[in-house]
């Protein structure tokens, strides 16, 4: 059987692409080396932030606004909401370049963002402590996503729509010819007119020339009481320290508050190098500088997990066809800030398989930027 689209890697982007392409009437085969959702990539750990006024650059705002529409639609397919509108407060020095980008994005796209000085911040959320030179930019319409629930939902909807799914079966080789794309797996060879490579951290095992660096990252859950929960209107957050370190976190659930450090981590070259949480001496203490100074009421570390970022050289996404192979789209280099975009990236992949022109300017995400 010849498929219209083969998806290599069915984590966040691949799961979304499988659903949207199948829903559009295409014959789709989804593949994955493991059984998604799983612990081997970048989507586990239950929750991910979604921010609209984007500190990483205005070019992302149209994408994330479309993603939000798709998240809202996906949430209707579950009794438990996939998106929780907790609000997100971005904390940092008043002269922070990241916060300047947030403010600029909000102004350009007329987004609901409130600026609070240090006193106003600590009055609204007495649990937060910041220096006098800090500000907060609060996005009331943003919040967090339940990442594994989202992937489970996409997989179920795709399967119900007739999508073929081949999991626990790594792709070993990709071949291109005039008739399309052929993949080799432990279960045999499969052929399609087009392919999406959304293999996450270890994409270079299939496409060695891609400029992607795997980075081992950790996040952890700390003891917290009801003051830090959504019931008390405590928001999700990002926080920039005076030395430039960037943290992110979520409202407490079941008396546990999850937090991670966005920058840093350990460069790795193979899956076995992604050691479990606490295998690196600094893991348990990584969040201490932020907690001690900004959230001093949080208790000790309860447990943690390791994941991986697939970093591009500039930490912007890679969304492009493979050089010389216009029938193969690669989406990678999401650099630790990609999950919130998964539905719109999946929709872009489905449009690619349908032969449609993208609805967004994807020029900033082309591979050619690295050869200029």
Swiss-Prot record:
One of its GO terms (molecular function) is sarcosine oxidase activity. It catalyses: N(alpha)-methyl-L-tryptophan + O2 + H2O = L-tryptophan + formaldehyde + H2O2. The keyword Transferase does not apply. It is an enzyme of class 1 (oxidoreductase). Its cofactor is FAD. Binds 1 FAD per subunit. Its EC number is 1.5.3.-. Keywords: FAD, Flavoprotein, Oxidoreductase. The keyword GTP-binding does not apply. HAMAP family: MTOX. Catalyzes the oxidative demethylation of N-methyl-L-tryptophan. NCBIfam families: PRK11259.1 (NF008425). Monomer. Belongs to the MSOX/MTOX family. MTOX subfamily. This is N-methyl-L-tryptophan oxidase.
